[in-house]
Amino acid sequence: MANHKSSIKRIRQEETRRLRNRYYGKTMRNAVRKLRSTTDKAEATAMYPGIVKMVDKLAKTNVIHKNKANNLKSKLAIYINKLA
């Protein structure tokens, strides 16, 4: 256990951030899963901007890497374009 007040506070903050990052990461993964399970092009096209916004925010806050975000957006766009 940490001895300094600032160290104890830092531990508290890190735990809060870790839980928040896990929540947002899981929410993003579920949204991507939902889009990938969709077979309707109109529905997928409507969902795509919201998912892109979510992915970009997570990349900006370093929850996910920026290259992963770009790869994910690209793969989802390809998936939507392949839908008939």
From Swiss-Prot:
Record GO biological process: translation
Gene3D superfamilies noted in UniProt: Ribosomal protein S20 (1.20.58.110)
A molecular-function term among this protein's GO annotations: structural constituent of ribosome
Protein family (similarity comment): Belongs to the bacterial ribosomal protein bS20 family.
A Pfam family that the UniProt record links to this protein: Ribosomal_S20p
This protein's UniProt keywords: Ribonucleoprotein, Ribosomal protein, RNA-binding, rRNA-binding
Function: Binds directly to 16S ribosomal RNA.
Top-rank taxon: Bacteria
Protein name according to UniProt: Small ribosomal subunit protein bS20
GO cellular component, one term: cytosol
Record has Glycosyltransferase as a keyword: no
InterPro entries: Ribosomal_bS20, Ribosomal_bS20_sf
